[in-house]
Amino acid sequence: MQQLTEIVEQALVIIDQASDLKALDDIRVDYLGKKGKITDMMKMMGSLSPEEKPAFGQAVNDAKQAIQQKLTERIDGLKSSELEAKLIAEKIDVTLPGRTQEIGGLHPVTRTIERIETFFGELGFSVKQGPEIEDDFHNFDALNISEHHPARADHDTFYFNPKLMLRTQTSGVQIRTMETEKPPLRIISPGRVYRNDYDQTHTPMFHQVEGLLVDEHVNFAELKGILHDFLRNFFEEDLQVRFRPSYFPFTEPSAEVDVMGKNGKWLEVLGCGMVHPNVLRSVGIDPEKYSGFAFGMGVERLTMLRYGVNDLRAFFENDLRFLKQFK
């Protein structure tokens, strides 16, 4: 009997020390299994006298029940602890704010276009749109670009057929507007344009904003004043601006406009000039009565200069690490 008591006491201590369900199952097998210590004690009954067997059998059963009860209690306790730990880990604090949907930001090119539209809108310019698939008259002929001009070459222009192409500038919008509306006109035409070029500073598709003002007695001084004010407004600095003589088929005289960079070098930002009389004639406007000026700027180039971006292609790669800087 003393040995049985020691077995039970030992089992109860080990059960209390068990830290997981697997350890408890091992204890059950060690004490109550077919080869367990309690089972071995039952086998000893064969060597006892008939008078001793009932008392010994009762003692073994009591020992077995004591161990089984302790195992059950410990198993229930561990399961309860595990469940409590799981509930704590998965606890939801209903007082915490919900997950808000992250607000996106405007693409830097869109920001630039909106900035340009806002400035010229305050000067009375309206925004006009036109087709991106253009015919040769609106893209070339009406703009005084001759049949053999280099801009018409296959390596510069995406042609569908000899008469139809992806527009190479938004100037076609100006032609269409002058065909349907009479002076005075003040318009800008932002949009996508296409040229067969791709490198660090050129992409096959890019954005352009062109402006047109047609009225009586328009002169180059007005053009200079408007563009000078625009550049200072856009870059938010009192920039040095210069106008260099240049050549464009659709303007005469023509100029390119530079601003002084922070490195002390001049940076080209746009082209401009007085509308060529041939362009006015092509749309039925009398160049003896009306004059006008036009200007054109690459949106990506202005955006690169404003935000200090070195590679034009970054605007089209949709890398959120890059785009999130402009939120």
From Swiss-Prot:
Q: How and how many cofactors are bound, per the record note?
A: Binds 2 magnesium ions per tetramer.
What does the subunit section of this Swiss-Prot or TrEMBL entry state?
Tetramer of two alpha and two beta subunits.
Binding positions (Mg(2+)): 252
Q: Name any GO cellular component annotation.
A: cytoplasm
Which positions form S-S bridges? none
InterPro entries xrefs: aa-tRNA-synth_II, aa-tRNA-synth_II/BPL/LPL, Phe-tRNA-synth_IIc_asu, Phe-tRNA_ligase_II_N, Phe_tRNA_ligase_alpha1_bac, Phenylalanyl-tRNA_Synthase, tRNA-bd_arm
The listed locations are: Cytoplasm
Q: Which reaction does it catalyse?
A: tRNA(Phe) + L-phenylalanine + ATP = L-phenylalanyl-tRNA(Phe) + AMP + diphosphate + H(+)
Q: GO MF annotations for this entry?
A: ATP binding; magnesium ion binding; phenylalanine-tRNA ligase activity; tRNA binding
The UniProt similarity line reads: Belongs to the class-II aminoacyl-tRNA synthetase family. Phe-tRNA synthetase alpha subunit type 1 subfamily.
Name the record gives this protein? Phenylalanine--tRNA ligase alpha subunit
Write down the required cofactor(s): Mg(2+)
Q: Name one Pfam family in it.
A: tRNA-synt_2d
Tell me which Gene Ontology terms the entry assigns under biological process: phenylalanyl-tRNA aminoacylation
What enzyme class is recorded for this protein?
ligase
Lineage per the UniProt record: Bacteria, Pseudomonadati, Pseudomonadota, Gammaproteobacteria, Alteromonadales
Gene3D superfamilies cross-referenced by the UniProt entry: Bira Bifunctional Protein, Domain 2 (3.30.930.10)
Which SUPFAM superfamilies does the record associate with it? Class II aaRS and biotin synthetases (SSF55681), tRNA-binding arm (SSF46589)
Q: Which PROSITE patterns match?
A: AA_TRNA_LIGASE_II (PS50862)
* EC annotation from Swiss-Prot or TrEMBL: 6.1.1.20
Q: Which UniProt keywords apply?
A: Aminoacyl-tRNA synthetase, ATP-binding, Cytoplasm, Ligase, Magnesium, Metal-binding, Nucleotide-binding, Protein biosynthesis
Q: What is its main location?
A: cytoplasm
